[in-house]
Amino acid sequence: MSSPIQELVKDIKNLQPVPAVINQILEIIDSPDSSMEQIAQIIQYDPAITASVLRTCNSVYFGLKTPAESIKDAITMLGMEQLIEIVLMKSGAKALSGKQEGYGLQEGAMWKYSVSSALIAKQIAVKLSLENKNTIFTAALLKDIGKTVLDRFVQDSFEKISALVVDRNYSFREAEKKIIGVDHAELGGMIAKIWKFSPRMVNIIRHHHLADVSMIKNKEIAAVYLADCICM
């Protein structure tokens, strides 16, 4: 009989990978030589993301007088920063939109929470004059990706986890770790590594709950942690 950890590894391997456009964009915007043309070129070769971005750009919300017909139009009308936010959010939507019944989350609930957390984390990063604010935004957006894999194990062990939370004052994350052998933040870090995210991204996702208090000195992790607390 396989252990929960072995089952988790199998589930991670079967998890649909995040669109490659996320890594490609983050690599470019972290470079001081990045340009609008490079960003547009990456996005326009992903038809699904392009269609989604143009649909969002041309929605009533933005109220543009002239419809955007290309990614370059969208960049000109919305600006690079806002376009990048839209692309990253649309790219991560599929992975985070399902039900997470073990966590009491209905369809779409985690996605809405993740977007709110990402937007707040970026605002904090700007206030603190942190570099790599788009990396912080993306890490905050995807920080709970581990829950998508851990969910069925949480459902199976919910009574045991709840008992630790109620009777022994464990946090839910601590109870996950105790019963299953790994918590969703650690698992999220594993997934981020498999998806070939940068070491910085992996580190932020893995430590976003600041279980290791020494990580409080890392302002990028602290920004995501604070955003998480604000959104709870």
Locate each region found by the language model.
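Conserved alpha-helical "signature site"
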Residues: M1-V166, Y170-M232
